[in-house]
Each structure stands twice: as C-alpha cells, then as structure tokens.
Amino acid sequence: MTRIKRGYIARKRRTKIRLFTSSFRGAHSRLTRTITQQKIKALVSAHRDRDRKKRDFRGLWISRINAVIRGNIKVYYIYSNLVYSLYTGQLLLNRKIVAQIAILKQNCLFMIANDIIKTKNPLRLYSGKV
C-alpha cells in the first residue's frame, strides 16, 4: 500500500476534537484515541439524557400534583382521578401547568378540583376502592 500523507488535515481534525474535550480531566483531554472515545461517549450521553430529562420532569410534575391533592383534607382526590376528570371535562391544562398551579397557588387547584367534583359523576371520586 502506498503511504497517505495527511499533514494539516489530520491535525485540523484532531484539534477540533481536542477543543471539544478540552474541559475533560486527565488523559480524556490529552490522548488522541481517548479523546475520540470520550467525545463519542459524551455525545451519546447527551442524546440519551435529552429524552431522559423529559421523562424525569413528567414524573416530577405528577408527584407534585399528587402530593398537593392528597395533602388537602377537604378535597381528597387522587392524581389519576383528577387527570381523568380534567380530560373528560375538556380542560386544556397539561401536567406542567397543573403542577405549577399546585405549587404556587394551591387554592386555585382546589377550586378547580371542587368544580370538577360538583360537575362529575361521584363514582369517580376516591373512596378507598374505585
């Protein structure tokens, strides 16, 4: 095989990768092979965790709503029944908005829940067994 002289092209490619990993510690920012592997690993983790973040936030919103709803003595409602009632009542409130209301203005959430309770079928309320 003939020798391929890359010269500045290879250096340019390695420099670009080095700039990406310049904040990494130890050999992960110095050795070319390790740099390449760590760059791939970092990009894979970033891609995976973007989806993971969406799942984590949805779980956080659900647990916040459930904690506030169950904490009230006057209106004992569980999360699943609340979301079902919001859905059947065609209220355009997603979990993120309801969680913000639950944290910042609990009275508003209880007003919404009471309104749903008055208009909905009482069988859907939580009484120990559904």
From Swiss-Prot:
Q: Where does the UniProt annotation locate this protein? A: Plastid, Chloroplast
> Main location per UniProt?
plastid
SUPFAM superfamilies with a match to the protein in the record: Ribosomal protein L20
What span is annotated as the signal peptide, if there is one?
A: none
- Tell me the domain of life: Eukaryota
UniProt entry keywords in alphabetical sequence: Chloroplast, Plastid, Ribonucleoprotein, Ribosomal protein, RNA-binding, rRNA-binding
Q: Name one GO biological process term.
A: ribosomal large subunit assembly
- Its Gene Ontology molecular function terms? rRNA binding; structural constituent of ribosome
Any one of the GO CC terms: chloroplast
Chloroplast as UniProt keyword: yes
Please give the InterPro entries that the UniProt record associates with this protein.
Ribosomal_bL20, RIBOSOMAL_L20_CS, Ribosomal_protein_bL20_C
Pfam families to which the protein is assigned, alphabetical: Ribosomal_L20 (PF00453)
The record, for HAMAP family, names: Ribosomal_bL20
* Function comment: Binds directly to 23S ribosomal RNA and is necessary for the in vitro assembly process of the 50S ribosomal subunit. It is not involved in the protein synthesizing functions of that subunit.
Family under the similarity heading: Belongs to the bacterial ribosomal protein bL20 family.
- PANTHER family recorded: 39S RIBOSOMAL PROTEIN L20
Q: What is this protein's record name?
A: Large ribosomal subunit protein bL20c
